[in-house]
Amino acid sequence: MIQIVDEITVAPERIPDVLALLRDRYLPGHAARGLTAAGRWVSPPVAVPEQPSTLWLTWHVADAPSYYRMRALTDGDVVAFWMAVDALCDARRRHVMTDADAPLPALTEVDHAA
């Protein structure tokens, strides 16, 4: 299984806006792309004056081919969603990982970018 963690640095007061975008514009199509929503968290667990919060969105897909299929299915609606999130947040990163004890498949494409 591939775990995906979106790390979004955002002002605490903008978190409801990001979650509304997620609910209205990303979640309706996530299953068709092979994504399963796994959780949403905020850190720190309090709003600190003048400091951003981190919104963590977690997902999973079945395996590496499913991850690349999900990426290939990115369409204009997905791009527009992330552009809208970027307009609200300070920074955003996506982490893609698998179980450390699982054997890693060999990369078969020479010019592949993960």
Please provide the spans of the model-predicted regions.
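An amphipathic, aromatic/His-enriched active-site/gating alpha helix that lines ligand/cofactor pockets
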Residues: 21-38, 50-51, 60-97
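Acidic/histidine-enriched, glycine/proline-rich intrinsically disordered or flexible terminal extensions
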Residues: 97-114
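Short amphipathic
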Residues: 5-7, 96-99
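Short, well-ordered beta-strand segments in beta-rich or mixed alpha/beta enzyme
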Residues: 2-9, 38-75, 109-113
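Residue-level signal for secondary-structure boundary sites
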Residues: 14, 64-67, 102
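Short, surface-exposed ligand-recognition loops at beta-strand->loop->(often short) alpha-helix junctions
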Residues: 10-19
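Intrinsically disordered, low-complexity segments enriched in polar/charged residues with Gly/Pro
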Residues: 14-15, 45-47, 81-83
